[in-house]
Amino acid sequence: MSAIVDIIGREVLDSRGNPTVECDVLLESGVMGRAAVPSGASTGSREAIELRDGDKSRYLGKGVLKAVEHINTEISEAIMGLDASEQAFLDRTLIELDGTENKGRLGANAMLAVSMAVAKAAAEEAGLPLYRYFGGSGAMQMPVPMMNIVNGGAHANNSLDIQEFMIMPVSQTSFREALRCGAEVFHALKKILSDKGMSTAVGDEGGFAPNFSSNEECLNTVVQAIEKAGYKAGEDVLLALDCAASEFYHEAEGVYSLEGEGLKLTSTQFADYLANLCDKFPIVSIEDGMAEGDWEGWKTLTDKLGKRVQLVGDDLFVTNTKILKEGIEKGIGNSILIKINQIGTLTETFAAIEMAKRAGYTAVISHRSGETEDSTIADIAVGTNAGQIKTGSLSRSDRISKYNQLLRIEEDLGDIATYPGKSTFYNLR
C-alpha cells in the first residue's frame, strides 16, 4: 500500500507574479509527488472557487495562505494514511470534506494541488511515467498543439477584442515536427512585426500583443507568417481563435461590443461575423464564440458552423460534467476545453473528458494564463488520448515546460507514438 505519511502545502508564485498553491505529498516508501496549480484571467462564472486571502496589505489581496493552511491542517488530517493509488476515493474524500457545490470552503486551488501531488507520488511509487499512470498501455497519441501566437482581449493591453489567435500544425507526422513548425512560424511572425515597426512584446501566454486595426488584419499577418516560414496555411497549418466572448458581451443590451472595430453586434450578427472570418481564413476551431450565458447565441453559432468548425466551450462548460451534459442535450458546441483548476480534482477532470468523447465532442487540454513550471497537463493530454493541447506560445518557460515534457513523452513512447494531425477533428466534415 502506498500510504500517505506527510502533506505540505506552500505559497509559491505563478507566471504573473501572483501567489498560487504548491503541494508535496510524501509516501511511506519515501517517494514524493509535487504539484503547483495555475490561475486564470478570463474566468467562467461557474468555475470552482479559487481561495484568495483578500488581505490588501499582502500581494494586493491575492495571497493563498488560507488555502495552504487548509492543506496543512484539515486536508492533511483527512487523507493521512490513505492509499495514494486510490485516486477516485481520495478525490471524493476531498469533495466531501469541502462540502460545497463550488469548492468554495477549502478552495479548488488547495484541493487540486493535493489531487495532482497524490497522483504524481502514486505514479512514482508504481515506477511509471505520469502519462502511463493516467492512461495505461493505451496512451500513445500525442496532442496537436493550439499555439497562441497573438494575444488580445484580457491577455494583452492592445486594441484586439478577440483574446487569442492560434496556429495548429496538422500536416506533420510527429509532435516534434509540429513543434518545430510552430516555432518557425512564431519567429517569422516576430520578423514581420519588427519590420512593420510593431511591438514584439509578449502577453501573458507568450504570444505577441501588437496593435492591429482589426481581427482580419491580424489573421492576414498570421497567414503571412505561416507562408514566410515555408508552410501552407490551410494545408500544413490551420488557424484557431479564442474569442472569450463573455468579456465583451453586454447582457443588458444583448450585444457583443467589438470596441477595436467599433461594432455592436447581436448574437446572430456575431455568428455571421465569425462565419465570415471562417470563409476568408482556414479557421478550424473557435473557443467561446458566444458568451457563457448566451445559450441561444451558442445554438445559433452551432447550427451555423458546428459541422465544419470545432466550437469549444470554455467559460461555457467550465470542465463541469453537469453543465456539459446539458450542453450535449441541447446541441450546444461540439468540443470542451479542459482546465483542471476549473473543477478542482483529477477524477472530475477525467470524467469531463470521458463524457465529451462518448458524446462525440472533442476535448482540448488547456493551461491557464497564470501558469507555473508544473507540466502535468502534458501528461494528461497523452494519458487520456485527448488529441489536442492548448498551452500558449513558443516563448516563456511556463509555456515551454509543457512542450518540452511532450517531447520527452514522445521520445519515451518511441515507435508507438502517433500524431493525429487533421484527424484530431474527428467530429467535423
Curated annotation (Swiss-Prot):
Residues in the active site? E205, K339
EC number(s) recorded for this UniProt protein: 4.2.1.11
Q: What class of enzyme is it?
A: lyase
Binding note for cofactor: Binds a second Mg(2+) ion via substrate during catalysis.
Q: Which cofactor does it need?
A: Mg(2+)
The record lists (2R)-2-phosphoglycerate as bound by Q163, K339, R368, S369, K390
Question: What GO molecular functions are on record for this protein?
Answer: magnesium ion binding; phosphopyruvate hydratase activity
State its location(s). Answer: Cytoplasm; Secreted; Cell surface
What PROSITE patterns does the record tag this protein with?
A: ENOLASE
Reactions catalysed, as given in the entry: (2R)-2-phosphoglycerate = phosphoenolpyruvate + H2O
User: Would you say which domain of life the source belongs to?
Assistant: Bacteria
Which keywords, in A-to-Z order, does the entry hold? Cytoplasm, Glycolysis, Lyase, Magnesium, Metal-binding, Secreted
Major place of residence: cytoplasm
Task: Give the HAMAP family listed for this entry.
Answer: Enolase
Q: What job does this protein perform?
A: Catalyzes the reversible conversion of 2-phosphoglycerate (2-PG) into phosphoenolpyruvate (PEP). It is essential for the degradation of carbohydrates via glycolysis.
The name of this protein is: Enolase 1
The organism of origin for this protein: Cupriavidus metallidurans (strain ATCC 43123 / DSM 2839 / NBRC 102507 / CH34)
Q: Which lineage is the organism of this entry classified under, starting from the top rank?
A: Bacteria, Pseudomonadati, Pseudomonadota, Betaproteobacteria, Burkholderiales
Give the gene name: eno1
